A protein has these predicted regions:
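Short, well-ordered loop/turn sites that connect or cap secondary structure elements
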Residues: 104-107
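Sec-dependent signal peptide recognition
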Residues: 1-6
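Short alpha-helix capping/helix-loop boundary micro-motifs
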Residues: 93-99
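C-terminal motif of bacterial Sec signal peptides marking the signal peptidase cleavage site
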Residues: 13-15
Length: 348
């Protein structure tokens, strides 16, 4: 089933450019630096992160005009450390007329670097080209950290990591297809969170970089326990997969976990509450012969299939289905505390 879904995604996805890492190098190393040739992007230095045309590679200092950001809600990546950067073309703004679906100006670039115990593993690039198509690709760092070259077919079980998997371009689309304009972590709820750093929602508003600044800024409803769980589900499940976008792979089953601007008035208005709490699941708690129970059984973790799926790895029911081989115990704890805080009620 997953293979069929991926094929459909590739066929239907609008405005995406597929690349191959095979072919001419497009770059050469000269005196410790990188010289880019022919407009190629086969080396990270050629993407503009450290300077144009390979400039700045020796120092690895991010170029002027590129902003670091850290969303207050983050995707679990098996414990790898991450750094994120964005570049908006001068004089442009992000179209935020639809608060849940930001649209980025052509020329926008985003980078995300993954490290394990301080060692760079990969850097991903999203670039909205002038014609509006998104280019998605990944750069694999060499073991000595001196080069980062394009890898489009992915790599499983990267040596020296807890099984980290570098996604192929099709794998990238599996998640990024869940957004109308591809970008996942640079959005209102995560950037407006109190834990956000760098280029936050407040700074975007202050600098006039949004066409329609949110009024009021989005705030996750409920108690601290509610907010922590809803925020975790939003970023790890809802933004990319469990939402109503046509290419979001998890939306068809009826479980919706993205926080929408119009539903932040109370916990009970959120899609996560309405589609999960007390709602019967098609999955069972323990395999084929387990109990038929709700996605979230109020007050009862053992009878909540959402908790069981997030606890699973290496099984078809694991959640998220890709991109992780290690259970996020801290995130699981947020969900457990939320479920246990709910008074037991009649199931729907």
């Amino acid at each position: 089933m997953r293979i069929v879904c991926l094929v459909v995604l590739v066929l239907l996805a609008p405005g995406c450019e597929r690349r191959s890492s095979r072919g001419s190098a497009g770059w050469k190393a000269v005196d410790g630096g990188i010289v880019c040739e022919g407009g190629g992007l086969q080396h990270l230095a050629c993407t503009g992160l450290y300077g144009e045309g390979g400039k700045g590679w020796e120092r690895r200092a991010v170029a002027a005009g590129i902003r670091a950001f850290e969303p207050g809600l983050q995707l679990w990546s098996d414990g790898l450390e991450k750094s994120r950067f964005i570049q908006l073309p001068p004089g442009t703004r992000i179209d935020t007329s639809r608060p849940d679906e930001w649209r980025f100006p052509p020329g926008t670039k985003l980078w995300k670097e993954f490290r394990w115990k301080g060692k760079p593993i990969e850097t991903r690039l999203l670039w909205k080209k002038p014609e509006g198509k998104w280019l998605r690709t990944t750069y694999r760092w060499s073991d000595d950290g001196q080069q980062a070259t394009e890898l489009t077919d992915g790599e499983k079980n990267v040596p020296g990591t807890p099984g980290h998997e570098i996604p192929s371009q099709v794998d990238c689309l599996t998640c990024h297809g869940g957004r109308e304009d591809e970008v996942l972590g640079f959005e209102a709820v995560a950037l407006g969170h109190e834990a956000a750093r760098g280029l936050t929602l407040a700074k975007l508003v202050e600098e006039g970089l949004l066409t329609h600044p949110p009024e009021p800024p989005p705030r996750i409803p409920g108690s601290g326990v509610d907010r922590a769980a809803l925020g975790y589900l939003h970023m790890n499940c809802g933004v990319s997969c469990h939402n109503t976008n046509p290419l979001a792979l998890g939306g068809g089953g009826g479980l919706l976990l993205r926080l929408e601007a119009a539903e932040l008035g109370s916990v009970h208005l959120t899609d996560a509450w309405k589609t999960a709490v007390g709602v019967r699941s098609i999955f069972r708690t323990t395999g084929l012969f387990g109990d038929a129970v709700p996605r979230i059984a109020p007050g009862d973790v053992k009878r909540s299939t959402l908790f069981h799926r997030m606890s699973a790895r290496g099984l078809p029911v694991q959640m998220p289905p890709i991109g992780t081989h290690v259970v996020d115990e801290q995130g699981l704890g947020l969900l457990q505390r939320w479920i246990e805080s709910m008074p037991a009620t009649a199931e729907r």
